Curated annotation (Swiss-Prot):
Region Disordered, residue ranges: 401-433
Similarity comment: family membership: Belongs to the UPF0300 family.
Functional summary from the UniProt entry: Has a role in meiosis.
Record lineage: Eukaryota, Fungi, Dikarya, Ascomycota, Taphrinomycotina
Pfam families named among the record's database cross-references: UPF0300
GO biological processes: meiotic cell cycle
Transmembrane region(s): none
GO cellular component: Golgi apparatus
Residue ranges with Polar residues bias: 401-412
Subcellular location: Golgi apparatus
Name of the protein: Meiotically up-regulated gene 131 protein
Gene assigned in the entry: mug131
Keywords per UniProt: Golgi apparatus, Meiosis
């Protein structure tokens, strides 16, 4: 591809990004005011400048967008407060991106460590790689984060109206806590299994997305699983020893640590926004302040330890950003981000915006008996899945992990079938779906 072709492609991509975000902001206003928005819902965003190349390959179309996500589920309700807040934010057109080393916090790190700016600081603007796919905006506070999301392609159809999500999972946490108390053996056995290496990405991601509902014991196991997964990625996707140490120290949120560091960018001309961007995923993230002082002056031993092993401005920028996000990462759609690479779903867009499985949404509204049954079946199925995964990986050679998978699955079944093991199933019947 010659320079002229690259210019045309870059210009087309930039125009698409701008129009898509203008459309998104207009739709936010409409959702809040209740006004009609029919004409521009079917307008051609890119005016034939970009064709939806390979769209059929992803089994995607404009209507494939969370059609069933607006439920009575308390974690998935449209938030008027979120829509109101969005109107006070100036969302940047993220057509020009910069590497994470361009954060102010990262630049100060380069100066203080007397590092070569040429070696560690790359200020060249990068064209946004996004062409079509998942388009979102994450903002709010750590206490109350919000997410706007929609599917965006060349044609913005009326079915692509964005959803405004407020993370409110207090009742789900209480329900999960009661389920764990009523079935402690199952949770304890699955903790020991989750802490073993080489579990499938689907199992890991499922529990990463349930992380905020879990007890401390199970949260610790999720972090161990994330650490084991990331150890296999060091040297790829921007992962370094810093990121492994961060996972070991349970720093940040596990959802955000699964984002490949090389896909995180600064937005040119904006100090309050960063983004995660790939060819088929783009999410703008509002951060109030990414300050190097918060890292340098922190008395938190974990932050001090992580800061001491930063080798360059990009690593320090990632550390400062992760610290600034805090628990806002709890609503980051990590499954949508990984879906286009790992093909986790048959659909182009995940069926649930907040959880890995659509059925996980029932934890917010189900009774304790149903939740206990659901988690039991989940543990059994995933232990079996891990066993099959290890068999394929080692070509049916017996391994300690595959043996443990069967043992835990059988142990759970025995415990579940024992008299009195389930307070909700008097006759000890197998749980229903």
């Amino acid at each position: 591809m010659d320079n002229q072709q690259r210019k045309v492609q870059g210009s087309s991509s930039n125009t698409f990004i701008k129009r898509a975000f203008q459309h998104l902001k207009s739709l936010f206003t409409v959702c809040f005011t209740g006004a009609d928005y029919l004409e521009s819902d079917i307008e051609l965003i890119c005016q034939n400048e970009i064709q939806p190349q390979g769209l059929e390959k992803l089994n995607a179309d404009s209507s494939n967008f969370y059609c069933n996500s607006l439920t009575s589920n308390q974690s998935l309700t449209t938030s008027m407060e979120a829509l109101d807040l969005s109107s006070s934010l100036t969302t940047p057109h993220a057509d020009k991106l910069l590497k994470l080393s361009n954060l102010i916090a990262a630049k100060s790190f380069t100066t203080e460590r007397k590092l070569s700016a040429a070696e560690f600081l790359d200020s060249r603007e990068i064209h946004n790689p996004f062409t079509y796919g998942f388009l979102g905006i994450l903002y709010g506070t750590s206490r109350t984060p919000y997410l706007h999301a929609q599917y965006a392609n060349s044609f913005m159809s009326e079915s692509a109206v964005p959803i405004s999500i407020e993370l409110n999972n207090r009742e789900a946490k209480a329900s999960m806590n009661l389920a764990e108390k009523n079935f402690p053996e199952g949770f304890e056995d699955f903790v020991s299994f989750l802490e073993n290496p080489n579990i499938p990405l689907t199992v890991l991601l499922h529990h990463v997305m349930l992380y905020d509902l879990y007890s401390n014991n199970l949260k610790d196991a999720v972090w161990v699983a994330v650490t084991n997964y990331m150890k296999n990625l060091v040297g790829n996707y921007g992962y370094t020893e810093l990121h492994i140490r961060a996972a070991q120290q349970m720093f940040g949120h596990p959802r955000f640590l699964l984002v490949h560091p090389e896909d995180i960018y600064c937005i040119s001309g904006s100090s309050d926004w960063v983004c995660v961007s790939t060819q088929h995923f783009h999410c703008n993230i509002h951060v109030h302040s990414v300050s190097g002082n918060a890292i340098r002056k922190s008395r938190n031993p974990i932050i001090q330890d992580l800061s001491s092993i930063c080798q360059n401005s990009t690593e320090f920028g990632w550390l400062a950003l992760t610290h600034a996000l805090r628990k806002k990462g709890a609503i980051f759609p990590i499954h949508a981000y990984l879906n286009f690479n790992a093909k986790l779903y048959e659909e182009c867009i995940p069926p649930s915006i907040l959880y890995f499985n659509k059925n996980d949404e029932n934890i917010n509204v189900g009774n304790i008996e149903d939740i206990t049954n659901y988690m039991y079946e989940t543990f059994i199925n995933e232990a079996s899945l891990c066993d099959k995964f290890m068999k394929r990986k080692h070509e049916r050679i017996e391994t300690p992990l595959s043996s443990q998978g069967r043992e835990i699955s059988n142990t759970l079944s025995r415990k579940r079938g024992a008299k009195g093991s389930n307070p909700f199933e008097i006759e000890n019947m197998m749980p229903h779906a």
